[in-house]
Regions:
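Short, electropositive alpha-helical surface patch
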Residues: 119-127, 155-161, 208-225, 252, ...
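Canonical Radical SAM [4Fe-4S] cluster-binding loop centered on the CxxxCxxC motif
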Residues: 45-89
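Conserved, mostly hydrophobic/aromatic
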Residues: 14, 37, 66, 162, ...
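Conserved C-terminal portion of the radical SAM core fold
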Residues: 107, 181-240, 252-268
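Flexible, acidic/Gly-rich N-terminal and inter-domain linker regions that tether
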Residues: 1-64
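Core AdoMet radical
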Residues: 74-93, 97-187, 196-200, 225-230
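C-terminal accessory regions of radical SAM enzymes
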Residues: 18-20, 25, 29, 48, ...
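Flexible glycine/acidic-rich beta-alpha junction loops that bind and position SAM and/or redox cofactors
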Residues: 149, 172-174, 203-210, 225-246, ...
Length: 296
């Protein structure tokens, strides 16, 4: 029995794999690895997947210096800049997406964190959406505190998004205006407020294979149930504009190994980059996508 099959059987029996096993899997034959990951996906997730999309609710002028990000005020990316969209605009887009079969709709905003006034604006938008729609609403509002998360939950937000982006070791190479611990603190605050958390990372930030595995295991340790696996789209004007884009084969390998690490988790994958061809995922992102203009 091959190494892939041995570890697959352990996972199918409900066991978690360790870092050493994940690193071993990364170097195994791709097609066998993907087929084994698909067996794990089918046993624990079936053929169910969710459709989700986003609205760029607030754009540009971010104080943070994340090297991949078009939203940062530190770089000249010619991105459109605007404050929080009107409640009616946010509601209209929610209804538009629900009519097209989307189950989750996320209000994504630029900046380190929404202030209290902005949080209330988002809450009002969510309440208005739920007057006319049953779509589930998520929010990506940065490094919020527990009180702010509780307000979002009371308004009807079911999930918040906060990517770790990369491993703890690699993070200082990506951003220096906030820390890994800042992100983890926000994720834990969301949990305390009783909101589900979506957290993952971007592949192609100069990370090593070990960094990718460390990210996956950090997310698993935090108890996150939905993990975005994003591919860097190098934005002109950012420090990472010349970073090489990972191949589809490399992304397949990453998602397959992550499936071994997360047997029951959902993966959120970008439809535009051909991830719909990766059959290990139970969740695909359709519709409007940002060019990694993510908040903290």
């Amino acid at each position: 029995m091959s190494l892939i099959q041995e570890i697959k059987e352990q996972v199918l029996q409900g066991n978690q794999i360790a870092k050493a096993e994940a690193l071993q899997l990364y170097g195994e034959p791709l097609e066998e690895l993907c087929l084994a990951a698909d067996e794990i996906r089918y046993q624990f997730c079936g053929n169910r997947f969710d459709l989700c999309t986003i609205i760029n609710g607030k754009s540009g002028r971010c104080s943070e210096n994340c090297k991949y990000c078009a939203q940062s005020a530190c770089y000249h990316t010619e991105i459109e800049e605007y404050p929080l969209l009107a409640v009616e605009k946010i509601k209209e887009q929610a209804k538009y997406n629900e009519e097209r079969g989307v189950l989750r709709y996320s209000i994504v905003t630029s900046g380190k964190a929404l202030n209290d006034t902005e949080v209330e604006h988002v809450c009002e938008s969510v309440r208005e959406i739920h007057k006319e729609s049953k779509i589930k609403v998520c929010v990506s509002g940065g490094l919020l505190n527990e009180t702010q998360f509780r307000k979002l939950k009371q308004a009807g937000v079911t999930r918040v998004h906060n990517n770790l982006e990369t491993s703890r070791q690699n993070f200082p190479n990506v951003c220096t205006t906030h820390t890994y611990e800042d992100k983890i603190a926000a994720i834990r605050a969301a949990w305390k407020a009783g909101i589900e958390v979506c957290s993952g990372g971007i592949m192609g930030l100069g990370e090593t294979v070990e960094d990718r595995i460390d990210l996956a295991l950090e997310v698993r340790k935090l108890g996150v149930k939905s993990m975005p696996v994003n591919l860097l789209n190098p934005i002109p004007g950012t420090p990472y504009e010349h970073n090489p884009v990972l191949t589809t084969e490399e992304m397949r390998r990453i998602v397959a190994v992550f499936r071994f690490c997360f047997r029951m988790h959902g993966f959120a994958l970008q439809e535009e980059e051909g991830f719909s061809r990766i059959k290990e995922d139970p969740a695909l992102h359709p519709g409007q996508m940002l060019q990694f203009q993510e908040t903290c």
